[in-house]
Amino acid sequence: MEQADADAFALLALIRQLGVASSAQLQAATGRSQPTLSRLLRALAAQVVVLGSGRSTRYGLPQPLLGAPAVQPLRWVMPDGRLHDWGRLTFLAGDRVHVQADGLDSLNQGSLPWFMAPLRAQGFLGRVLARQWAQRGLDANPDRWSLEQVLATALLLHDAPGALVLGEPPAGSVMPPATGTAPDLDALADEVASTLPAGSSAGGEQAKFLTHDETGHPLIVKFTPPLDTPFGERWHDLLQAEALALQVLAEWGVPVAAAQVLQTARRAYLVSRRFDRLPGGGRLHAVPLDAVHGAFVPGGRQHWGATCRELERQRRLPPGAGAQAEALLHFGRLIGNTDMHFGNLSLWVQPQEVPRGRFSGLAPVYDMLPMRWRPDMAQGLVDIEPFEPDAVALGSPAREVALQFWQQLAALPAASRALRRAAQAMALRLQRG
């Protein structure tokens, strides 16, 4: 082996060991001068990628994304529908992701950067997609995908939540042709249900699909099992409660995902307008609180209020956002929502604020319903019984809002008798305090 080849081989091995390295780091490790190192790097231009610019320039080894190029454009769909060339992503050896954008030089190992969290296939829709992509050798559970697999599939997710698009977007719409009328809803629900194993709900998440209304506005639609089954009847009740909870919150001035319940002879549907989509193909970017906490908040996850108050203290959220999150938490506890995990609250972020890690506020409320009565595949149906309200939440301003919810649910003709009875009992408990 000639000396030049040996030097190049040694330099590649060193960069692989370090993951990414600056010129100064490589000079110190090899003992080579800057001109010599520059000549070696030029000779390795096909194997080494340059990251950043100026004094922040570093070098890494690109790693293809399941055959796709390691370097991919990151585009931001603006509110008016324009596609903005926002940044560049490079997947590197050692499970590293580098993102460069205006004012941003981000390097993560083993995970996506926080602002790309919406591009990860997850939840019910993610599991449905994973089953569709099984022929590509992917695990049926996207939670078990490698980072390379997550990024490779993100190249295909051009209708993912939020405004970021990885790779080249396809020409034309990727939305299904249905318009959200009752017959279309049944057909779409049957199509989704047919992809799942018998008795499965894809990991326990609420079954749902994407479509659009007659004006072309994107929708996300939850659907029940067949109504002539115990689980179908229970989910019908829960979707009615969810629609009412959002309606009550909206009456109190809280931004919510606008939703309504539609029912056919076979199923019930909660049809929600996607709040991250705008007329004319425009989009907005909302990031789950889980990803934001992981990036900026030290320590474990307590609850929405604690995390948002800390983000407000760091001046990443505007004043009052922490109190808003805490009020939603109290409302949820008072209506029996036992599923307020950190993926069920999101924060708005503008493209120019990503480098600073600042957020413009809480995104509209979604998935707010009495999940304590959710049917369970293992345990079956739990009885719809009144419960003891959370003492802290009971002493908060959310009590009045929750009382209105229970009173209206108790009088809701579409709810079952059992749900109306429990709602009436809960209203009395909240009145008594």
PLM feature segments, named:
Residues 1-433:
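Phosphate/dinucleotide-binding and metal-coordinating scaffold of catalytic cores
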